[in-house]
Amino acid sequence: MLDKVERMYATPPYPPFPRAEYTDRVRRLKEEMVKAELDVMVMWGENNIRYFTGFLTNHFPPVTVCPGVLIIAINKEPVMIVPNFFQGVVEGFTFINDIRVQHNPHVTENLRGMPREVAEVTKELMGSSKGRVGVEGGIKGGMTIPRPLNDIDEFRAALSEVEFVYAADQIWNVRMIKSLLEVEALSIACQADVKAYHDLIAEFEWGWTEKDVGLFVRKKLLDYADECLPNLCMSSRRKVFMADIPAWDEGIPLMPGDRLVLEPLPQVKGYWGSSGRTFHMGPAPEEEIHKIQILDRGRQVAAEMTKPGVTSGSIMDAINDTLEDGGLHCSLDQGGHGVGIDGQEPPAIALGETFEVQENMVLALECWMFETDDNGHHRVYGGEDYVHVTKDGCDLLPTFPTDIMTLGK
């Protein structure tokens, strides 16, 4: 049984964004719901709930409780359902007035009964047992409901007369368009990368391993940002090509002539920054510099053509054409993606995509080439930068200089 509780404070003492931002996000979602003829939207996902309300807890990865459910109806205030010990978290971070709490949420019977409780609130907000209910699923962006399948089956069974609609499109249509506050957070996060890179260039010493570099950058990021994940860091000395891994393995040396791919992952207010780079260890020969410059040119061309109305697939085509004109190739079918509080969001800048770029998106533009040298070493070239789409083009967010391409003297 859920209890509806009253707020202790009329306004949250620690909101991550102002009331006007909260109101605008919910308003835009309701507009999308009207277009899709949805009566109610039910969201279980951490980042969707965080985006629309500001609610944040470390308890989403474990599934030993259901940490939060957000329900939004067209003509009613949003409702948050949380374990009773998270009531203060809702009040501290969010402007939500309708808070429902579950008691003894760790008890298995109550945990497995939560979907039925959510269904009852859904019917209450619809004013009926029938209607169209949006859930986190669909083609765009790979959105999912992060609960056990049996919980979702129970939820659906309790709403047997409801028409469920995959509503990822409606959610992403709101989340893809960034406010000035979001762009600012992304910019600060990218600036953290730039600062950490400059620190690395200044302080790197021969004898460091791949892990030493990864830990150094991570420690620096924590001085400049709120949080960071383990950096993506891979040396060409690895015996097998291992993309997008953290630098946790011992004994991977960095030697003159090697290449190192590095992508720090700082977060500011939950928003991911990036300025992915590849470095030549020690002075780079002309052949290497030529490859690096062509990959950099690929990102530059992508930025030059990024503006509202351009399809994301055409940006990918331009990247491929630029690399091919330089005698190289793009090793991935993707040249970027949207960014926000998910590290990768729609739209995908990928082969054949027809999605049109829109003003106030923030996009990661990237191109990469992988090859194996005569010694069997796996060498990576390329990088990634962010752009903010404006009315007639785009602006680069803070980015590390492309003319600094070597690490170690």
Task: Describe these PLM feature segments.
Residues 1-409:
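Active-site neighborhoods and metal-handling regions in enzymes and metal-associated proteins
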